A protein has these predicted regions:
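Short beta-strand segments that buttress and anchor functional surface loops
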Residues: 67-68, 90-97
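Beta-strand/loop substructures that line and gate deep hydrophobic ligand-binding cavities in soluble
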Residues: 94-141
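Hydrophobic pocket/interface hotspot
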Residues: 24-29, 81, 118-120, 149
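Hydrophobic ligand-binding cavity/cleft-lining segments
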Residues: 1-60
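Secreted/surface-exposed cysteine- and glycine-rich disulfide frameworks
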Residues: 57-75
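A short, structured loop/turn motif at beta-sheet edges
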Residues: 19-23, 83-87, 108-117
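Short coil-to-beta-strand transition motifs
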Residues: 72-78, 99-101
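Small-residue-enriched segments and motifs
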Residues: 79-80, 106
């Protein structure tokens, strides 16, 4: 895991090799959210969705338009699809109530015929001291070992 900042944005980047072709890995991360849920800690996503609803946000109730396909502009729970590069990249922008702005990006590239390199990057642009406190307060949850991912 790499934790860094760039121009006031906190970046948390994780990479791992996955024993699956890139197309299969891309298919998995493009089906996240909605009825499918998330790859680990669904309880934490549910709690975050509940808190978001209490704060007047959209929560997790939106689900998603299609369980298998994403397009730019689609809602995925409390995220909005900001970028899609078929077979390669999915970037989600947070629409939940936050003291800042956040994005979650999944990127995959072939390492060889049967192995892929998966990169997950969380971006957070904190708004003031409350944004920094939010990031570091919830960092232990974000720091869950990526081997818990069910790839």
């Amino acid at each position: 895991m790499v934790l860094a900042t760039h121009e006031g944005i906190i970046l948390e980047r994780r990479q791992r090799l996955v024993r699956s072709p890139a197309a299969a890995v891309y298919g998995v991360f493009c089906r996240l959210g909605g009825e499918t849920g998330w790859l680990c800690m669904n309880w934490a996503w549910a709690v975050r969705g509940f808190v978001d609803r209490v704060l007047g946000g959209v929560g997790l109730r939106r689900g998603r338009r299609d369980p298998h396909e994403v397009r730019v502009g689609d809602a995925v729970d409390f995220w909005r699809v900001e970028a899609v590069e078929p077979g390669r990249l999915l970037r989600l922008r947070a629409e939940m109530k936050l003291p800042g702005r956040a994005w979650l990006e999944f990127r995959v590239e072939s390492a060889d015929a049967d192995t892929s390199r998966l990169t997950q990057t969380a971006f957070f642009a904190p708004r003031g001291l409350s944004g920094l406190l939010y990031w570091y307060l919830f960092y232990p949850i974000h720091a869950v070992n990526p081997t818990a991912w069910r790839w």
